[in-house]
């Protein structure tokens, strides 16, 4: 693969390799740096500010621009993205924590083009907050290795870690992911249907999200399409926009049932979500909480490790479907050095972690 100019900036002064040189925490290969756990301190933090401003705030003035230039720049670039990704390698439907983790893992291969479809204006799903609108995010070990790879600090406990604010995870993974040249996020865009050819999912039917929500009030609002070699459905649990991928598969007879997720059981749920992440029909992989809907697995509540690892597993399943090296088949770069602690426990484990 040709070298690319995009680089990561370390927390230290040492330069880091280009993004595709970073090794995945999914298959246990070494990564470029680790972030130490947060040390709790009761001292007031100090903020240092530069004594020299890059501009004079008293007399600040922008360079002139024509309004039409702004319009043309936005329109031209978006239309070129639509043309580029009208036929792509992977389409990920849903930009929650599982979908973003999947896209991040896929984007390490610069030869794979990844389009992300998100019906909301703001991607991230429920990963902007922890449970009950609280801010902290709990991640059970060993999924914290993914946080190390992303460079996210956390408070380390015996069997889990806690991120100060869930938004730190979501904003960090998005900032790294969306900077990569082989990824495009189409937010405020809904996947209204699937493209199916000869019993294989071959893409998605798209429309502006606001149009999708108003088909009953307007007429003649036909959709667009996006062909893909692989579709990853990461639509979350059941709801107005949830589990839409598997519900559509049922309605067209490609699967028999969508029983819905069972009551909460964290210790069973997270392992089950990762284990059951798979290609459910030819051309379509299901990841995240949508897995619980199709398999009747328990809901997990406000823990997020399974979303991250399920997304990574979905990425490697997609790589396998594309004929690329992947951790599922063990032919991914340095995959043979998988660390034992990255192999999740069996779903039937009886161990319960209590803070």
From Swiss-Prot:
Substrate binds at residues 98, 118-119, 126, 191, 222, 237, 289, 299-301. During the catalytic reaction, a sulfide is transferred from Cys-220 to a reaction intermediate, generating a dehydroalanine residue. It holds the Pfam family Thi4. It is found in: Plastid, Chloroplast. The keyword Oxidoreductase does not apply. InterPro entries: FAD/NAD-bd_sf (IPR036188), Sti35 (IPR027495), Thi4_fam (IPR002922). The modification 2,3-didehydroalanine (Cys) is found at residue 220. GO terms for cellular component: chloroplast stroma; cytosol. Its EC number is 2.4.2.60. One of its GO terms (biological process) is thiazole biosynthetic process. Gene3D superfamilies: 6.10.250.2840, FAD/NAD(P)-binding domain. It catalyses: [ADP-thiazole synthase]-L-cysteine + glycine + NAD(+) = [ADP-thiazole synthase]-dehydroalanine + ADP-5-ethyl-4-methylthiazole-2-carboxylate + nicotinamide + 3 H2O + 2 H(+). One of its GO terms (molecular function) is iron ion binding. Keywords: Chloroplast, Iron, Metal-binding, NAD, Plastid, Thiamine biosynthesis, Transferase, Transit peptide. Homooctamer. Belongs to the THI4 family. Involved in biosynthesis of the thiamine precursor thiazole. Catalyzes the conversion of NAD and glycine to adenosine diphosphate 5-(2-hydroxyethyl)-4-methylthiazole-2-carboxylic acid (ADT), an adenylated thiazole intermediate. The reaction includes an iron-dependent sulfide transfer from a conserved cysteine residue of the protein to a thiazole intermediate. The enzyme can only undergo a single turnover, which suggests it is a suicide enzyme. May have additional roles in adaptation to various stress conditions and in DNA damage tolerance. This is Thiamine thiazole synthase 2, chloroplastic. The gene is THI1-2.
């Amino acid at each position: 693969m040709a070298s690319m100019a995009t680089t990561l900036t370390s927390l230290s002064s040492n330069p880091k390799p280009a993004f595709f040189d970073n090794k995945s925490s999914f298959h246990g290969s070494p990564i470029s740096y680790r972030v130490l756990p947060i040390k709790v301190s009761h001292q007031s933090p100090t903020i240092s500010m530069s004594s020299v401003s890059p501009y004079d705030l008293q007399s600040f003035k922008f360079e002139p621009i024509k309004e039409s230039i702004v319009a043309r720049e936005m329109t031209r670039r978006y239309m070129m993205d639509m043309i580029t990704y009208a036929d792509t390698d992977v389409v990920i439907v849903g930009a929650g924590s599982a979908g973003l983790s999947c896209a991040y893992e896929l984007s390490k291969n610069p030869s794979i083009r990844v389009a992300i479809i998100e019906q909301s204006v703001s991607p991230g799903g429920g990963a902007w907050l922890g449970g009950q609108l609280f801010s902290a995010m709990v991640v059970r070990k060993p999924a914290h290795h993914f946080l190390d790879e992303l460079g996210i600090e956390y408070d380390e406990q015996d069997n889990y870690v806690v991120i100060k604010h869930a938004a730190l995870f979501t904003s960090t993974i998005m900032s790294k992911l969306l900077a990569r040249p082989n990824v495009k996020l189409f937010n405020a865009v809904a996947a209204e249907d699937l493209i199916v050819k000869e019993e294989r999912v071959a893409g998605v039917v798209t429309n502006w999200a606001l149009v999708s929500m108003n088909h009953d009030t307007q007429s003649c609002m036909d959709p667009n399409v996006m062909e893909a070699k692989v579709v990853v459905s990461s639509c979350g649990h059941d709801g107005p926009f949830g589990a839409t991928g598997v519900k559509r598969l049922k309605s067209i007879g490609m699967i028999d049932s969508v029983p819905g997720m069972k009551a909460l059981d964290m210790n069973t749920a997270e392992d089950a979500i990762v284990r059951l992440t798979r290609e459910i029909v030819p051309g379509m992989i299901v990841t995240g909480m949508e897995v619980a809907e199709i398999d009747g697995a328990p809901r997990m509540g406000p823990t997020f490790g399974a979303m991250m690892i399920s997304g990574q597993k979905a990425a490697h399943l997609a790589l396998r479907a594309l004929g690329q090296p992947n951790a599922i088949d063990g032919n991914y770069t340095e995959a043979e050095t998988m660390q034992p602690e990255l192999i999740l426990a069996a779903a039937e484990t009886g161990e319960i972690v209590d803070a």
